[in-house]
């Protein structure tokens, strides 16, 4: 399809003040996705009974035995909605990394809201087994709160959630230490969710962490916990630790251990046995590739690997077992917290996208920074993960804009091109973004359910992204509801 576009060079280089998140006095609305509890007598997808329905089922059923849904930006791309839809066609939905810093809100068919941070998104599909893998850090009070909320609303969790015996435990003190660490960093703070994720992974890395399997040995648990708490007290002056705290924590975790026991499993064995049995497995990634500890905008990253490699290390399955990976990317870009954001729109333009897209964090409620879609970063994510297809979300948010920009290239100040996404943040600060300007569309597309019915300009936008990135867009989101997903 041919169309006209123009190139525009951003004359304002990325500046350091953009990297540090400033709280914006906006009301924190929250995003949501809609899902329903599946009953045996109802169809697995509530889709229109036309050719689009047939195409969608064919698309989903063609996915490989082990498939994954991963974020392509800095998180908050809308992965939960796609996972919820796909989960109805998979036997297992598994989390492989992260912790309660990942979050989304889902609703059942009766409008009941579930705020989930640890339990995999497949929990509302009654035939789906949910696995929390060894790469996840588990905050037991948070997990039990989610389970209680689900059970009280009629969603059975018994026998449907497995927690890896190799997963590390995230304690309340990890969260306290997380806040103390941010306070130490002052103006250069990272913008963590303060859920204790970094400190827990740090404990894991220096090998004094406590794993789920340790709950089965309460005779040695107090000594291990004492080492952890003493280490935190020696590191942070503001952290007060004494014998009474240890006694209270040990008693609390004795109760937790008893309650968690039915959920504990050797999930590495479960996953590999399921692969041998030809069961279909969907891996749900938390956060996104641009927050990856190795490949993201370090140090403004998370502490795990939310890219393709994290699937294998976080679940204990072989790389050759992993097939289709779907990258989820917003039609524009958002970021929560500090860190580089080359295509960020400051001022009124950013506010417009923020309110139109209701861009406020599910986990923190913080307003998200907004900007144009960064093709350079997206291509980088596609290279790392080898995506077979993309899910372009929130395309409807761009409706009514007179023009839409794509950040298609980075250039040095002298105009020479820079052909990759740099690791050096100082270099990234100096680069300028080259934009391609495309026409907008002046109509609401949120009720459209067939790609052919899109305005020409919307089709041009989607197809230009495919052309620039080299990966097909198979799924397009035009609203929060389950039915607001177009299969291309």
Curated annotation (Swiss-Prot):
Cofactor needs: Mg(2+)
GO cellular component: chloroplast; cytoplasm
SMART domains named among the record's database cross-references: Adenylsucc_synt
Keyword Manganese: no
UniProt catalytic activity: IMP + L-aspartate + GTP = N(6)-(1,2-dicarboxyethyl)-AMP + GDP + phosphate + 2 H(+)
GO terms under biological process: 'de novo' AMP biosynthetic process; IMP metabolic process
Location of the protein in the cell: Plastid, Chloroplast
GO molecular function terms attached to this record: adenylosuccinate synthase activity; GTP binding; magnesium ion binding
Binding site for IMP: 76-79, 101-104, 193, 207, 287, 302, 366
Presequence boundaries: 1-34
Binding site for GTP: 75-81, 103-105, 368, 394-396, 477-479
E.C. code: 6.3.4.4
Binding site for substrate: 362-368
PROSITE patterns noted in UniProt: ADENYLOSUCCIN_SYN_1, ADENYLOSUCCIN_SYN_2
Record's cofactor remark: Binds 1 Mg(2+) ion per subunit.
Residues that hold Mg(2+) according to the record: 76, 103
Subunit structure: Homodimer.
Protein name per Swiss-Prot or TrEMBL: Adenylosuccinate synthetase 2, chloroplastic
Species classification: Eukaryota, Viridiplantae, Streptophyta, Embryophyta, Tracheophyta
Gene that produces this protein: PURA2
């Amino acid at each position: 399809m041919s169309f006209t576009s123009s190139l525009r060079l951003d004359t304002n280089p990325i500046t350091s003040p953009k990297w540090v998140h400033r709280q914006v006095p906006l009301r924190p609305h929250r995003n949501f996705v809609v899902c329903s509890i599946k009953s045996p007598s109802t169809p697995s997808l509530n889709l229109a009974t036309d050719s689009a329905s047939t195409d969608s089922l064919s698309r989903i059923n063609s996915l490989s035995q082990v498939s994954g849904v991963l974020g392509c930006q800095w998180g908050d791309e809308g992965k939960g909605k796609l996972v919820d839809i796909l989960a109805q066609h998979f036997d297992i939905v598994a989390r492989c990394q992260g912790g309660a810093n990942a979050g989304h809100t889902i609703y059942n068919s009766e409008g009941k809201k579930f705020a989930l941070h640890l339990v995999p998104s497949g929990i509302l599909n009654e035939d789906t087994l949910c696995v929390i893998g060894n790469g996840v850090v588990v905050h037991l009070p948070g997990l039990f709160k989610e389970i209680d909320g689900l059970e009280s609303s009629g969603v059975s969790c018994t026998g449907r959630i497995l927690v890896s015996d190799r997963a590390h435990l995230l304690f309340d003190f990890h969260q306290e230490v997380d806040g103390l660490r941010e306070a130490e960093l002052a103006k250069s703070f990272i913008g963590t969710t303060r859920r204790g994720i970094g400190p827990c992974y740090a404990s894991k890395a220096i090998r004094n962490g406590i794993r789920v399997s340790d709950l089965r040995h309460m005779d040695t648990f107090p000594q291990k916990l004492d080492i952890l708490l003493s280490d935190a007290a020696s590191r942070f002056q503001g952290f007060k630790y004494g014998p009474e705290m240890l006694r209270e924590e040990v008693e609390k975790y004795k109760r937790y251990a008893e309650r968690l026991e039915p959920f504990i499993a050797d999930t590495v064995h479960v996953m590999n046995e399921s692969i041998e049995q030809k069961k279909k497995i969907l891996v749900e990634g938390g956060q996104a590739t641009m927050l990856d500890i190795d490949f993201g905008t370090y140090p403004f990253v998370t502490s795990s690997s939310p890219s393709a490699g994290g699937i294998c290390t976080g679940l204990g399955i072989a790389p050759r077992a992993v097939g289709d990976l779907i990258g989820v990317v917003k039609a524009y870009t958002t970021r929560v917290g500090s860190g580089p954001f080359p295509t960020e729109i400051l001022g009124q333009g950013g506010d417009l996208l923020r309110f139109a897209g209701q861009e406020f964090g599910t986990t923190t409620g913080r307003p998200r920074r907004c900007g144009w879609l960064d093709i350079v970063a997206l291509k980088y994510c596609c290279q790392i993960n080898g995506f077979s297809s993309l899910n372009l979300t929130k395309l409807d948010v761009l409706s009514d804009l007179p023009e839409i920009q794509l950040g298609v290239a980075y250039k040095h100040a002298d105009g020479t091109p820079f052909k990759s996404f740099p690791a050096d943040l100082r270099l990234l600060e100096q680069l300028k973004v080259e934009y391609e300007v495309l026409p907008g569309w002046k109509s609401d597309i949120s009720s459209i359910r067939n790609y052919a019915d899109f305005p020409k300009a919307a089709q041009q936008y989607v197809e230009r992204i495919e052309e620039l990135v080299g990966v097909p867009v198979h799924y397009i989101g035009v609203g929060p509801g389950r039915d607001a997903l177009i299969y291309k």
